[in-house]
């Protein structure tokens, strides 16, 4: 059977952990290449390699590998304008109820998808996957973004999006499924300082605002910068910053 290679976004948490397991146990015999992203506001990104190691030890290097931590600050900053320079009344007029926390998640997750597309091109993968769940109170994980916009973005790059745990709505069952696979449910998830889920159910105006910003600002900027073209990979795919010596 042909090996189907997947770029999997691995945060180190239990959702992306289980996503890796489900892909590897799938009848399609996926081969996964795990990657972690650091947006510049995260702690503990380097610890995620310990989670990847647990997966590799069980399934073997032929099926699973870890590409490391990639810095995506240079992608995310492209999407800050015009939001950061808008007055509150302007923000509400143009982008309805989009909160700062949902804005942060929007630009960050989009940056992850772009870098995943670059990695897929570089690693000759056909799929991109993540551990997003629709019940986690982030607009980027609701159907309008995950199933529609991000799926379309990935498809535009001639790739396919896989969401192995998207319909899972019970942490108890998630942990039990990991236990049945022989894993203790302790992980080393990185901590984002600006990622903040909605306190209650997500208001439709928040969803509409996130969709509007993506449609009107982010997607046109992605195309303007040719981020989905294969030549871009040669220029921008880097997993560290240079450092000045003393």
Regions picked out by a protein language model, each given a short descriptive name:
Residues 1-246:
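Nucleotide-activated chemistry modules centered on ATP-dependent adenylation/adenylyltransferase
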């Amino acid at each position: 059977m042909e090996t189907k290679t997947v770029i999997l976004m691995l945060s180190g948490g239990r959702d992306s952990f289980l996503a890796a397991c489900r892909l590897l146990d799938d009848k399609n015999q996926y081969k996964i290449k795990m990657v972690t992203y650091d947006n510049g506001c995260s702690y503990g990104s380097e610890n995620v390699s310990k989670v990847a190691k647990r997966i590799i030890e069980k399934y073997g290097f032929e099926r699973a590998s870890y590409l490391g931590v990639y810095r995506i600050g240079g992608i995310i900053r492209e999407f800050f304008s015009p939001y950061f320079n808008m007055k509150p009344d302007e923000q509400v007029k143009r982008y309805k109820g989009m909160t700062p926390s949902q804005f942060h998640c929007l630009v960050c997750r989009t940056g992850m998808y772009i870098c995943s597309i670059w990695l897929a091109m570089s690693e000759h993968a056909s799929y991109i996957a993540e551990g997003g769940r629709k019940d986690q109170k982030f607009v980027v994980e609701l159907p309008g973004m995950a199933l529609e916009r991000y799926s379309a973005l990935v498809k535009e790059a001639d790739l396919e999006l896989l969401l192995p745990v998207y319909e899972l709505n019970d942490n108890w069952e998630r942990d039990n499924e990991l236990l049945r696979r022989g894993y203790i449910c302790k992980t080393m998830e990185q901590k984002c300082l600006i990622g903040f889920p909605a306190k209650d159910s997500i208001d439709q105006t928040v969803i509409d605002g996130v969709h509007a910003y993506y449609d009107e600002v982010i997607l046109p900027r992605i195309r303007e910068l040719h981020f989905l073209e294969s030549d871009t990979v040669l220029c921008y795919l880097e997993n560290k910053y240079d450092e000045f010596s003393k």
